[in-house]
Amino acid sequence: MTPPFCWYYPPLQEGILCRRYQRFFAEIELTSGDRVTAHCPNTGPMTGICQVGAPVQVSYHADPKRKLAYTWEMIFVDGTWVGVNTSLPNRVIASALAAGILPELAGYGTQQREVAYGQERSRIDFYLTDHPQEPPAYVEVKNTTWAQGGLALFPDTVTSRGQKHLRELQRLRQTQPETRVCMLYFINRGDCDRFAPGDSADPTYGQLLRAAYNQGVEILPYRFAIEPRGIQFLGTAKLLL
């Protein structure tokens, strides 16, 4: 049975990646032969997926207020489409939560976004309430694109912000043991069925993730298939710690 789509892209245009530069820009040659500058909505290193000459898909926006009309949405590497637009995962998760298709998080009647929590008043991506049986849940979302042979890895570089989030989630778990605290990894490619911390990129993050898990923070590595039509939820990846 083919998994249902939980997100649909607008009409996309195909091209090839000529280069990515200054983090926010990508030069794309469309199939029409036109070369355009597209916004790159991913400020990270894009380890393993930023391959010159690879097929890409871009969206077009005719808004005169935009500096760039095109946005780079995905790239085809290692036989699979990989999502590039880091603004999408939270929107996809919101849609999937509303549809009740995420097994560990199904059944919550209310979702709130960017809710302040903890001593530092950081903002959690989702705060879920009104479940008939489960306690409220705090859910932080991380976009994951780095992979090695079917193993999804996060992070792909040192992330002090990510380390901070894990420390805050551990404190949240300690101070509010009556609630659920979840770290959700959005695996933005359909060819991975396992997930592990990217220890070679950021060993401190890996140590913190294992410590958080041991303290009761739930680790939810969710698999998604990306294609030009839309995004499908494939289930939960095997967690390797």
UniProtKB/Swiss-Prot annotation:
Signal peptide: none annotated. InterPro entries: SfsA, SfsA_C, SfsA_N. GO terms for molecular function: DNA binding. CDD domains: SfsA-like_bacterial. It holds the Pfam family SfsA_N. Belongs to the SfsA family. This is Sugar fermentation stimulation protein homolog. The lineage of its organism: Bacteria, Bacillati, Cyanobacteriota, Cyanophyceae, Acaryochloridales.
